[in-house]
Amino acid sequence: MINRKATAVWKGTGKEGTGTVSTQSTVLENTQYSFNTRFAEGKGTNPEELIAAAHASCFAMKLSFELNAAGFTADELNATATVTLDPAKGQVTKSAIELKAKVPSVSADQFAQIADKAKKECPISQLLNAEITLNAELLS
């Protein structure tokens, strides 16, 4: 088992308070988040942005492994995840992955099947209880 951790510290009320988030790797260290970073365009990060980063990076790495297992090596995988938060429900309802990929010698059908498998089997996809969509474009 591999364990990774992050710590969040929140002070004050939900709307007026502020928080910081730090990761074990220290890539994030006392990074600010607040109501305004989550529900407006305030300076700092927010949980949904961090989930999007986790999903995009996990998917790209999983796709690389799946392509390799099928005998292909990607020149580049550019994945962007957009996480949707429904404030009325107070829940993440969707993560949409946009992918642009350069993979020599793979057919469009092979690529679509491999990308779909990676979408379903990526550990972050499995963690999310939300709709997950994939728009994959194979570049020449």
Predicted regions and their residues:
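Extended beta-strand/beta-hairpin segments
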Residues: 1-53, 60-140
